[in-house]
Amino acid sequence: MIFIVISIDTRPEKRDDFLAGITRYCAQVRAEPGTVRFTCSEDVEEPNRFVVVANYADQAAGEAHVASEHAQWFFGWLPSVVSRVPTIVYQELPGAGWSEMSEVRLESAT
């Protein structure tokens, strides 16, 4: 599995543009074969800082994503809305996906 986390700081005056673009992009990426998860969340303490979490089934799925028309659009468009170059963590991990967190157990309803 490919696991990617990207930190994106947007320019305050471009926030609405970023939200519109990332919403469109997320939907396109989620529809790709081999995408396990693709989400974008805003940091609760840093306004205009967003974190993208992307998981692909394998390297081939990740490569297909990067080559896609919408990814090429995103990479070209992103500089128009960010305040700094995004930072990224990229890891190839064993396994096929997410598993339950063993430290947490749900409370039963009474």
Where are these regions (language model features)?
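Glycine-rich beta-strand-turn "strand-cap" elements at beta-sheet edges
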Residues: 39-48, 75-110
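Short alpha-helical
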Residues: 13, 45-47, 57, 69, ...
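Short, surface-exposed ligand-recognition loops at beta-strand->loop->(often short) alpha-helix junctions
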Residues: 9-18
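An amphipathic, aromatic/His-enriched active-site/gating alpha helix that lines ligand/cofactor pockets
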Residues: 24, 28-36, 55-90
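Short, well-ordered beta-strand segments in beta-rich or mixed alpha/beta enzyme
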Residues: 2-8, 39-66, 103
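Short, flexible segments with low predicted structural confidence
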Residues: 1-2, 17, 33-35
